[in-house]
């Protein structure tokens, strides 16, 4: 046993260290590498020196029963004394089976947890550490509190593959990792805590003890608001990368609190309902944008502490802004300190690279056929809602989870039990995650980034769906951008590209997304996808944004689009805020602001987004003129007419059939001079006439500016 202790290879330290139940063995054994002496300290009694048993072992052979007695140890470190509680006197370090296997409670018990244990009538505060490493032959806790010496604090093998140890008097902010021996006794790289709530950056990547109970939330009004049906709400998401929205004068990151001070008033002014953060889970490589996470339970410390991130969410909520996080359950990186070969085995991924390795991203794929892995991920999703009060998660790369042959050639994948390409384990996990989120957090939303035609992504699980609240409309994004990039003179040949998305617009609960994916890897900015000279580019962009806000579906724009950013997104720099010195870009920003407020204030533009009753074509086949028109209809019967002219040719005396007799009042014109448009005179109040057009008995006459979208309300 001494040899195992000296090699940090002991799996049952409580059988050898601490107080003995059998007094014939002695009263106490202490293992303290590097100590020159150890003494027993009992309250109100003289100290008793322990004998040196081996090089690092000390034993007390006095006739004392310390099994139920609280005691301390006076450690002599070459003349420097340290008074500590012996962790091996605390046997009550386990938790109930259900607590360790139920996703809603797992994160309250695994990892490092502040707790108080009772011993000899005394309440002893400290931190309990639990880690799942079923194939390890030994696990030690190492950290700044023991000079990263794996011999000092061997952990006890408990049931169900879990190892545990309680360290008395350990404070918040202490760095730690796990030192393990693999199945054959081989040494492994120090591992960060998979359940760690806080982590250090390069080079240590160590986990840090953190107490969730300390932060005092101020968002009770937001958290207790009535449960609403999100499909009927106006949802406008501002997708944001925390490290590159703005920088300080030195070019450094804003921390979470500084970001809150700058961003929250901006979101309120611009009319966004939610901020959608690209992944904030701890990730070692900044250039991954967060999509290679190692610490799923820790908000990245690049921008501050977990308390600072809570402050950010709190500030958003107090201003009426919801917070959605990108969540990455599809894969994880191969960093030595992370989940890869965690206990010396592929604990979190399939050992067969055809199922366990993502060749495009050079990362491991979670083995969702393992119950513990599924529980780990579902627990993580619930954790962010519970501990950080987030309002939604956008699940990254869902298609890569659903299909076993995703981005794989013949022979590079293994079929399921029925010979097909669907990943049954991933499907079951996603369904379970959605059910758990909506069960415990009924006001939450889950959003899928899913790029295929997999059926029922946003259908309830009881109807056979995956159970997501919404799905990104990747088809709309692809088709609409493909259309708008064409020169106006060529758009008539691509008219179906613009109208086709309406064929399936209500097959899912869609979010129309112009995300970060469209402004990276040489794709350029949204602004610079537009054809023509500078004025035409901006006019096209304004018309396109108007078209987007008039279409059925919730809205998402990546940061920078709202100011007409011309450069491709660069994560190493802030947005091109200097562009707001120019009227054209001021106009794009002003238009985005007005579109958000219009979308939120007009029920017809959002409350039937997800059902066919909210949309009617008025003009869909005017390919030669590159004009489309439709009406959006609210539950209460309100109607808003949206007309887009995608050529630089103004249309005077343009007659359009309408189903209702009445007046159509102008709500918004993307070509308005206040948006740096041409200021072409438009009809402000169009009264219907009994003139047949488009097979409708009534019609109105409009003036359509070049490259524009107009919104009219029937009154």
Swiss-Prot record:
InterPro entries recorded: A-amylase/branching_C (IPR006048), Branching_enzy (IPR037439), GlgB (IPR006407), GlgB_N (IPR054169), GlgB_N_E_set_prok (IPR044143), Glyco_hydro_13_cat_dom (IPR006047), Glyco_hydro_13_N (IPR004193), Glyco_hydro_b (IPR013780)
Function per UniProt: Catalyzes the formation of the alpha-1,6-glucosidic linkages in glycogen by scission of a 1,4-alpha-linked oligosaccharide from growing alpha-1,4-glucan chains and the subsequent attachment of the oligosaccharide to the alpha-1,6 position.
Description of how the protein assembles with itself and partners: Monomer.
Pfam family, one: GlgB_N
Enzyme category, top tier: transferase
Keywords, sorted A to Z: Carbohydrate metabolism, Glycogen biosynthesis, Glycogen metabolism, Glycosyltransferase, Transferase
Origin species: Vibrio vulnificus (strain CMCP6)
Protein name: 1,4-alpha-glucan branching enzyme GlgB
Active site: 396 (nucleophile), 449 (proton donor)
PANTHER family xrefs: 1,4-ALPHA-GLUCAN-BRANCHING ENZYME
Chemical reaction(s) catalysed: Transfers a segment of a (1->4)-alpha-D-glucan chain to a primary hydroxy group in a similar glucan chain
């Amino acid at each position: 046993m001494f040899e195992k202790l000296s090699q940090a290879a002991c799996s049952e330290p409580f059988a050898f260290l601490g107080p003995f139940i059998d007094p014939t063995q002695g009263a106490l054994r202490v293992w303290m590498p590097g100590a020159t002496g150890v003494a027993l300290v009992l309250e109100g009694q003289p100290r008793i020196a322990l004998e040196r048993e081996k090089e690092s072992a000390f034993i007390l052979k006095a006739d004392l029963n310390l099994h139920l007695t609280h005691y301390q140890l006076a450690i002599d470190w070459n003349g420097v004394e340290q008074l500590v509680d012996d962790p091996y006197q605390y046997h009550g370090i386990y938790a109930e089976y259900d607590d360790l296997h139920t996703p809603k409670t797992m994160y309250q018990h695994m990892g490092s947890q502040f707790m108080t244990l009772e011993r000899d009538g005394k309440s002893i505060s400290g931190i309990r550490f639990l880690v799942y490493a079923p194939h390890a032959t030994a696990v030690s806790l190492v950290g700044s509190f023991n000079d990263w010496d794996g011999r000092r604090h061997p952990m006890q093998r408990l049931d169900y593959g879990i190892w545990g140890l309680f360290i008395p008097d350990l404070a918040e902010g202490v760095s730690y990792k796990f030192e393990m021996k693999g199945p054959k006794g081989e040494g492994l790289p120090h591992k960060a805590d998979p359940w760690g709530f806080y982590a250090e950056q390069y080079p240590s990547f160590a986990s840090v003890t953190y107490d969730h109970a300390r932060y005092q939330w101020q968002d009770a009004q937001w958290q207790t608001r009535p449960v609403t049906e999100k499909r009927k709400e106006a949802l406008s998401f501002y997708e944001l990368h925390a490290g590159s929205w703005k920088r300080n004068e030195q070019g450094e990151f804003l921390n979470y609190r500084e970001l809150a001070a700058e961003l929250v008033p901006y979101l309120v002014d611009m009319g966004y309902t939610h901020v959608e953060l690209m992944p904030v889970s701890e990730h070692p490589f900044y250039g991954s944008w967060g999509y290679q996470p190692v610490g799923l339970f820790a908000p990245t410390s690049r921008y501050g502490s977990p308390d600072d991130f809570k402050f950010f969410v709190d500030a958003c909520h107090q201003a009426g802004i919801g917070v959605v996080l990108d969540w990455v359950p599809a894969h994880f990186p191969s960093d030595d300190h992370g989940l890869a070969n965690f206990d010396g085995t592929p604990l979190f991924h399939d050992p067969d690279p055809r199922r366990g390795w993502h060749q495009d991203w050079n990362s491991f794929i979670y083995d969702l056929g393992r119950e513990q892995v599924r529980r780990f991920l579902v627990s993580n999703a619930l954790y962010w809602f519970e501990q950080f009060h987030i309002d939604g998660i956008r699940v990254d790369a869902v298609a890569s989870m659903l299909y076993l042959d995703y981005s794989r050639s013949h022979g590079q994948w293994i079929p399921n039990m029925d010979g097909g390409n669907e990943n049954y384990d991933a499907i079951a996990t996603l369904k379970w995650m959605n059910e758990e989120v909506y069960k415990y957090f009924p006001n939450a939303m889950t959003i899928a980034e899913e790029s295929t035609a997999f059926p029922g992504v946003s259908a309830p699980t009881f109807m056979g769906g995956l159970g997501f609240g919404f799905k990104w409309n990747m088809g709309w994004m692809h088709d609409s951008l493909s259309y708008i990039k064409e020169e106006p003179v060529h758009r008539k040949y691509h008219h179906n590209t613009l109208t086709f998305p309406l064929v399936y617009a209500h097959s899912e609960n869609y979010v129309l997304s112009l995300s970060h994916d469209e402004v990276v890897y040489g794709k350029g900015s949204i602004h610079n996808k537009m054809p023509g000279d500078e004025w035409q580019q901006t006019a096209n962009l304004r018309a396109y944004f108007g078209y987007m806000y008039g279409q059925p579906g919730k809205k998402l724009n990546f940061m920078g689009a709202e100011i007409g950013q011309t450069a491709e997104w660069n994560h190493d720099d802030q947005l091109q805020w200097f562009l707001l010195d120019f009227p054209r870009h001021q106009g794009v920003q002003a238009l985005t602001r007005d579109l958000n407020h219009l979308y939120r204030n007009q029920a017809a533009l959002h409350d039937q987004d997800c059902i066919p009753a909210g949309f009617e074509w008025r003009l869909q086949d005017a390919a030669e003129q590159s004009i489309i028109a439709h009406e959006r209809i609210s539950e209460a019967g309100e109607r808003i007419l949206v007309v887009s002219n995608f050529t630089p040719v103004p249309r005077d005396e343009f007659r359009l059939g309408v189903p209702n007799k009445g007046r159509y009042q102008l709500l918004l014109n993307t070509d308005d001079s206040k948006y740096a448009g041409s200021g072409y005179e438009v009809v402000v109040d169009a009264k219907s006439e009994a003139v047949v057009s488009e097979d409708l008995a009534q019609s109105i006459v409009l003036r359509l500016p070049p490259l524009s979208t107009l919104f009219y309300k029937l009154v």
